[in-house]
């Protein structure tokens, strides 16, 4: 009798475990956005959606934006940069005008949850095509990238989260080149608490303008966003010889 009871008890435990595993498989953990939105009150959620619209004034493709396109960039990197702006680690140098404007803009963000919402929203968007404006020697850029960049940013510029190296394959060429120049000039990566920024600032010292253009042109050409036709290409017929 006791043996039968033990058998039934064991059978019941196994059945319960199978049931729990089945429920877990059918009910996976919610995606980050679901977790964020469930945490937010309706009023706060509506406000965060308004913040997205505010961000798109400078970071959208429909406006005369001069900020980088953020669509498809990694959540962890976007969140980290927003927090750096909010804490004053970035955006406090008036000589770096675009970054200084961002330092002013993030004052609209009230808390970490709103930062998380914004980072998550942009990370979920499909990367947008970009006009390729940076010209360089692709072969030299390839050699430079493999020797000095791939170890932290990945063989295909896909990023390396463990080394805090963001993906470079979603960056527009003009923005990529601008940021490298700012690292080199000490306009970015100067704050004592900006550990990853300081690494980049040190790594960019002594790099020539030609080498910067070469590596940016290579990364964008080999791994970057889909090529977007320029305004001239869109307005002038393909066979036209007339100047624009």
Language-model region placement:
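Bacterial N-terminal signal peptides that target proteins for export
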Residues: 2-15
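Axial heme c-ligation environment in periplasmic c-type cytochrome domains
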Residues: 64-71, 86-115, 125, 131-136, ...
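Bacterial signal peptide processing site
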Residues: 27-29
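Sequence/structural segment immediately N-terminal to covalent heme-attachment motifs in c-type
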Residues: 32-61, 134-158, 232-239, 244
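C-terminal motif of bacterial Sec signal peptides marking the signal peptidase cleavage site
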Residues: 22-25
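Extracellular/lumenal glycan-associated surfaces
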Residues: 73-74, 80-81, 171-172
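C-type cytochrome heme c attachment motif
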Residues: 50-60, 80-83, 104, 116-120, ...
